[in-house]
């Protein structure tokens, strides 16, 4: 009973939308078609027992961390209407595909503070790109055009060009653009949904990954030993040479080669040692005389009389 009631509600909505013979839908202009399809779309979704398929598909498609995540194994899928484009090819499916939901993109605010090696503080705003409602509506129109073009390419082999031109109708702002120009524009847009800033990141490198900088390695210069600092300065000095400066290492090796090419050095004559008998004048003789007099007095030896020099002159 529930199944019969659901099918009846879907048929009633389609009949009200298209008309008994399809003449009502053909007589409408694009604006009226959009208005009628927007009113009938919730009834058709309720008849299927599903919610807003477009919103669910976009919630899966616009996951900002799905492409940047390393552990995520799920790939973003197209909306459910693109997986089975041949299931609904009547006027109701075309009317549903023309409806564009005015969704506002979610905004995630994220500010990151980083410190440079010189101590400067750098604050970067890594929030997702948020656009106005007009920009969102324009992106949704482009995405809707992509859907219809993909359905058109799938069905153009089965249908004639006249039927395709009758079923595929562009919005008012795209009426003056040819189909080839529109295909080139969509290919230039890479046939994908509106991209966020997070979608531009390589999947193998998350946004939270920061590449190490070489100048940060010399931040703890006080902990480096003197030998490493000497070689660092020497490498910097060798890399920045003055114009016209001689390479001292090459000059030294050249002089060393010249020294090795010479003959053996002549031997110097040996020094002949000559003994020196010079006696430095000191008090050694006087002290020796005193020591002799003391020894004679201790032994009771009388000193010799000097006959030539009388002790007591007359």
From Swiss-Prot:
Q: Does the keyword Nucleus apply?
A: no
A single GO BP term for this record reads: cilium assembly
Region (Disordered) residue ranges read 64-106
Cellular location(s): Cytoplasm; Cell projection, Cilium; Cytoplasm, Cytoskeleton, Microtubule organizing center, Centrosome, Centriole
Pfam families cross-referenced by the UniProt entry? HYLS1_C
Q: Where is the composition biased (Polar residues)?
A: 88-100
InterPro entries (alphabetical): Centriolar_ciliogenesis_assoc, HYLS1, HYLS1_C_dom
Family under the similarity heading = Belongs to the HYLS1 family.
Name of the protein this chain belongs to = Centriolar and ciliogenesis-associated protein HYLS1
- Native species of this protein? Bos taurus (Bovine)
């Amino acid at each position: 009973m529930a199944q019969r009631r659901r099918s009846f509600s879907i048929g009633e909505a389609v009949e009200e939308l298209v008309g008994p013979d399809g003449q009502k839908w053909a007589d409408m202009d694009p604006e009226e078609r959009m208005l009628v399809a927007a009113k009938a779309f919730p009834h058709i979704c309720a008849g299927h027992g599903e919610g807003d398929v477009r919103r669910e598909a976009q919630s899966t498609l616009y996951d900002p961390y799905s492409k940047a995540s390393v552990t995520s194994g799920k790939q973003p899928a197209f909306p459910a209407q693109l997986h089975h484009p041949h299931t609904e090819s009547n006027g109701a499916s075309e009317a549903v595909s023309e409806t564009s939901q005015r969704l506002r993109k979610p905004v995630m605010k994220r500010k990151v503070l980083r410190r440079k090696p010189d101590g400067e503080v750098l604050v970067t705003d890594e929030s997702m790109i948020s656009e106005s409602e007009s920009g969102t509506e324009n992106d949704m129109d482009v995405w809707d055009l992509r859907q219809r073009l993909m359905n058109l390419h799938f069905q153009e082999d089965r249908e004639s060009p006249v039927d395709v031109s009758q079923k595929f109708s562009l919005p008012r702002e795209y009426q003056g653009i040819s189909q080839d120009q529109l295909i080139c524009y969509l290919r230039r847009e890479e046939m994908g949904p509106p991209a966020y800033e997070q979608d531009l990141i390589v999947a193998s490198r998350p946004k939270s990954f920061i590449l190490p900088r070489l100048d940060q390695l010399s931040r703890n210069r006080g902990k480096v030993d003197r030998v490493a600092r000497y070689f660092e300065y020497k490498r910097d000095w060798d890399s920045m040479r003055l114009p016209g400066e001689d390479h001292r290492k090459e000059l030294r090796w050249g002089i060393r080669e010249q020294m090795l090419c010479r003959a053996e050095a002549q031997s110097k004559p040996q020094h002949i040692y000559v003994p020196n008998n010079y006696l430095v004048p000191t008090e050694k003789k006087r002290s020796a005389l005193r020591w002799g007099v003391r020894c004679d007095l201790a032994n009771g030896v009388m000193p010799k009389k000097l006959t030539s020099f009388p002790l007591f002159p007359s």
